[in-house]
UniProtKB/Swiss-Prot annotation:
<dbReference type="InterPro" id="IPR012677">
    <property type="entry name" value="Nucleotide-bd_a/b_plait_sf"/>
</dbReference>
<keyword id="KW-0677">Repeat</keyword>
<feature type="region of interest" description="Disordered">
    <location>
        <begin position="73"/>
        <end position="116"/>
    </location>
</feature>
<dbReference type="Pfam" id="PF00076">
    <property type="entry name" value="RRM_1"/>
</dbReference>
<keyword id="KW-0694">RNA-binding</keyword>
<comment type="function">
    <text>RNA-binding protein, which is required during gametogenesis. May be involved in the actin-dependent anchoring of Vg1 mRNA in the vegetal cortex of the oocyte.</text>
</comment>
<protein>
    <recommendedName>
        <fullName>DAZ-associated protein 1</fullName>
    </recommendedName>
</protein>
<dbReference type="GO" id="GO:0048477">
    <property type="term" value="P:oogenesis"/>
</dbReference>
<feature type="compositionally biased region" description="Basic and acidic residues">
    <location>
        <begin position="184"/>
        <end position="195"/>
    </location>
</feature>
<feature type="domain" description="RRM 2">
    <location>
        <begin position="114"/>
        <end position="191"/>
    </location>
</feature>
<dbReference type="InterPro" id="IPR000504">
    <property type="entry name" value="RRM_dom"/>
</dbReference>
<comment type="subunit">
    <text>Component of a mRNP complex, at least composed of DAZAP1, IGF2BP3-A, STAU and VgRBP60. Binds to the 3'-UTR of Vg1 mRNA. Interacts with profilin, a protein involved in actin assembly. Interacts with VgRBP71.</text>
</comment>
<feature type="region of interest" description="Disordered">
    <location>
        <begin position="184"/>
        <end position="345"/>
    </location>
</feature>
<dbReference type="GO" id="GO:0005737">
    <property type="term" value="C:cytoplasm"/>
</dbReference>
<dbReference type="InterPro" id="IPR034134">
    <property type="entry name" value="DAZAP1_RRM1"/>
</dbReference>
<keyword id="KW-0217">Developmental protein</keyword>
<feature type="compositionally biased region" description="Polar residues">
    <location>
        <begin position="203"/>
        <end position="231"/>
    </location>
</feature>
């Protein structure tokens, strides 16, 4: 059967044929729709086994429309898929190219592709198993599986190159294939136009596929750029989302966290009493706020309830629950002892300086 462009008028491509279907049974089936002048089933050159597709040519080109209007078609217990063969010079260009695909132009000898894209490959399927499976559609000349550059493990998709285009047509016609118990998607791979297309992801060479440009099918292997880090369960977490209830992770898009609480400083002078261990009774412990975040600073005329009594004379302040030291009135408690430097509260946040010898 000739494959010249003018000879494709009135011709059907028939895919999904059973392995037992012969040219005689194929011709006999389609003869009910009109006179068949030519019929062929494509076979493997080595094993002479049917490759599962063929071509039928009618004397009257109008018979093609009759066949298409009579779908579905079943032959030898299997659903077959007849499609019209449009001469290459008459193939319409796409008005809107799909994402990640170039505008389709009349194909030349140099732009013909015998390559298919295979997505959703099982993790336990290697190049040998892929080649063995796709050999049923024709001679496989190359198998390329895309690997993660860092982890050196398959990313779940790859490319198969056949010896001829008829093998590509047959493989793509099935669309979904069952490989090692998993549904695998097969699409035709088109060579990119290097002048009009930006380079694809690493490992894609010059071949494009929608799955390489979109995360919808889950084959890109990379999460969106707005996602950072891992949750304790190993799942991707959006930037700023809390992980385990501990607030925003440090270094993931937020400012450095401030100290969780202001230091409490206690100064002592030599005396008969040992230095205090920890904080004096009744004085503050760190406030119960989450990691790295404390309460907002109080206004200048207010004091936080950190357990440290406010200076006497402050409006609204409660009276002290203990007497002042000998020789000093309650009004003088807000002043630093003589000979001591006065440190403003604003310099150390909510810290309070207390000289223990004044309270003993």
């Amino acid at each position: 059967m000739n494959n010249q462009g003018g000879d494709e008028i009135g011709k059907l491509f028939v895919g999904g044929l059973d392995w037992s279907t012969t040219q005689e049974t194929l011709r006999s089936y389609f003869s009910q729709y009109g006179e068949v002048v030519d019929c062929v089933i494509m076979k493997d050159k080595t094993t002479n086994q049917s490759r599962g597709f063929g071509f039928v040519k009618f004397k009257d080109p109008n018979c093609v429309g009759t066949v298409l209007a009579s779908r579905p078609h079943t032959l030898d217990g299997r659903n077959i898929d007849p499609k019209p063969c449009t001469p290459r010079g008459m193939q319409p260009e796409r008005s809107r190219p799909r994402e990640g695909w170039q505008q389709k132009e009349p194909r030349t000898e140099n732009s013909r592709s015998n390559k298919i894209f295979v997505g959703g490959i099982p993790h336990n399927c290697g190049e040998t198993e892929l080649k063995e499976y796709f050999n049923r559609f024709g001679v496989v000349t190359e198998v390329v599986m895309i690997y993660d550059a860092e982890k050196q493990r398959p990313r779940g998709f790859g490319f198969i190159t056949f010896e001829d285009e008829q093998s590509v047509d047959q493989a793509v016609n099935m669309h979904f294939h069952d490989i090692m118990g998993k549904k695998v998607e097969v699409k035709r791979a088109e060579p990119r136009d290097s002048k009009s297309q930006t380079p694809g992801p690493p490992g894609s060479n010059q071949w494009g596929s929608r799955a390489m440009q979109s995360t919808a099918n889950g084959w890109t292997g990379q999460p969106p750029q707005t996602w950072q880090g891992y949750s304790p369960q190993g799942m991707w977490m959006p930037t700023g989302q809390t992980i385990g209830g501990y607030g925003q992770p440090a270094g993931r898009g937020g400012p450095p966290p401030p100290p969780s609480f202001a230091p409490f400083l206690v100064s002592t002078t030599p005396g008969p009493f040992p230095p205090p261990q920890g904080f004096p009774p009744g004085y503050a412990t760190p406030p119960p706020f989450g990691y790295g975040y404390g309460p907002p600073p109080p206004p200048p005329d207010q004091f936080v309830s950190s357990g440290v009594p406010p200076p006497p004379g402050t409006p609204g302040a409660a009276p002290l629950a203990f007497p002042p030291p000998p020789g000093q009135s309650a009004q003088d408690l807000s002043k630093p002892p003589s000979g001591q430097q006065d440190f403003p509260f604003s310099q150390f946040g909510n810290a309070c300086f207390v000289k223990l010898s004044e309270w003993i």
